[in-house]
Structures are given as structure tokens and as C-alpha cells.
Amino acid sequence: MTERVALVTGGNGGIGTEICRQLSSGGYRVVTTCVNPEAEGVEAWAAALREEGHDIGWVQCNVADFDACARMATEVEAEFGSVDVLVNVAGITRDAFLHKMDADNWRSVIDVNLNSAFNVTRQFVTGMRERGFGRIVNISSVNGQTGQFGQTNYSAAKAGMHGFTMALAKESAPKGVTVNTVSPGYVRTSMTDAIPDKVREAIIGQIPAGRLGEPQDIARAVAFLVADEAGYINGANIPVNGALFCSF
Ligand code: CAA
């Protein structure tokens, strides 16, 4: 069988990098999107991964922009081939209490974290259906399940992502395409580094595992879901949160 192609949006972020690593180790041809290659230092990022033995491709794309995603899909398919696996990771926070939140911070989080799932997935789902195989994983958050102080925008987007997953799973299952969500808890990345120290320490105190998650913990769940053998797991949400939030 030819190598499967996996596209990871925001694959050069904290969680994304580890997803790229694990998929590359699993034999996938991995490509990531990044918004601003220079500012994000994506060349150096790719070179460091190459040193480790991972040849990760990258394309510039603002996933909040539908037309940019259409252009990105053409570029990816021309250079790397049909996309079999899509992992929607790209996400941002703009935390503020709602009574202090401006409209830009509401809109940018909904655009980057939720509208992107439509903008990117829409480009690849037709091909997956036609080929009778596809794996889509949406990275949500425990805060989409529970709500969080300062995150009406982020919690709404992340909860919306799983609604998107469930509806698309029903549409896609007859065509051999699975769509699942992974909901990380608090993971050691620059995003959690930005939480005020006092608040972060209080959050860690509530995690039964007694620590933040590691990006590897999340990537493991993604690698499991995208496997060819995982075809009957569809429309599911896998929480990876150290028992911070348990539900049935
Ligand atoms: N839990 C409990 N109390 C919290 C809290 C939290 N998560 N966040 C804020 N508070 C409390 C503060 O401790 C403070 O209480 P006191 O007045 O008693 O000291 C009160 O709310 C007001 O907080 P601030 O003084 O910080 O007010 P602010 O307007 O300057 O900022 C805030 C508010 C933006 C919510 C800021 O506190 C903050 O950034 N909190 C962290 C929010 C958070 O948890 N974000 C998650 C980011 S990581 C992520 O999103 C990844 C993921 O998927 C899990």
C-alpha cells in the first residue's frame, strides 16, 4: 500500500508537533499548515524534526480563511498526493471575562478554532468519500465540555467542534470515513504557560493525575484513532485529561 498522507493544521505548535512526530513514526507522510512561516520559524522547526528523522512538509495557510484553505488543498494534493488523514489542531486563546471581551477576540477564536474545521475539512471530505477511506480528528478541549473562566469564546468553539464531529461522522460512516474528537485537558505547552501562575497552580491542584498532560499523551490518542484498524470508532470523543473531568 502507498504511504498515507496526513495533514495536521497547526502542526508546528506544542501539541501539533508531537502529533506530527508520532504520525511520521507510524509511517505517514505528514504535512502541516502554518499561518506565518517566518514569524513561526517553520523552516528551523522542520529542520530540527528532520534531524530526528522526521521529514515533515509544510504549507502556509490561514485556516480561518476559506479561500486560502481551498488554495492550500490544491497545493498539498499537487505536492504530496491525496489526503487520507486530517487532524484539525490549529487553535488560539483570547481569554477575557465576557464583560470585558471585545468583538475581535470573540470572532478570532470562533474563526480559528471552529470555522477552520469547516474551512479545512470541506476541502478534503469529498475525496475521502470518493476513495472510501478517511480519518478526521478534531482537537477540542476539556474546556468545551465544562466551560472555563475567561473562555466563553474558546469553550463555545470547542463544544461546537464536537457537534461538527458527531454530525459529520453520521454523514461519513457509510463511505468509510471516520470523524472523531480528542479533548485534551491542560497540557504543558505555550498556551498553558500563558495562564497566570496562581490560576495555573490552582488548576493543577484539581487534576487527579497531579500534573499537566504532555503533548505525547494527546498524540497517542490521535495515532490510535487514525489507524486503518480504527474504522468502527466514529463520532466519538476521547478525553485525555488526567481524570480532571470524567463523564459517561
Ligand atoms: N479558576 C478559578 N478562578 C479563576 C480562574 C479559574 N480558572 N480564572 C480566573 N479566576 C479568578 C481569579 O483567581 C480572580 O479571583 P480573585 O479576584 O479572587 O483573585 C478572578 O477570577 C479575576 O481574575 P483576574 O484578576 O485574573 O481577572 P482578569 O480580568 O485580569 O483576567 C482571566 C481573567 C482572563 C479569566 C484570567 O484570570 C485568566 O487568564 N484565567 C485563566 C483562564 C484559563 O484557564 N484559560 C485556559 C487556557 S489553556 C487552554 O485553553 C487549553 C485547554 O484547552 C485546556
Segments predicted by a language model, with ranges:
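Short C-terminal tail/terminal secondary-structure segment
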Residues: 146-149, 223, 234-248
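Conserved glycine-rich cofactor-binding loop
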Residues: 12-13
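Active-site helix of classical SDR
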Residues: 121, 157, 165
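Conserved glycine-rich Rossmann-like NAD(P)H-binding loop of the short-chain dehydrogenase/reductase
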Residues: 26-43
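Residue(s) in the substrate-gating loop at a strand-loop-helix junction
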Residues: 141
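Substrate-binding pocket helix/loop in short-chain dehydrogenase/reductase
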Residues: 97-98, 105-110, 192, 203
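Alpha-helical segment proximal to the catalytic Tyr-Lys
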Residues: 126, 170-174, 231
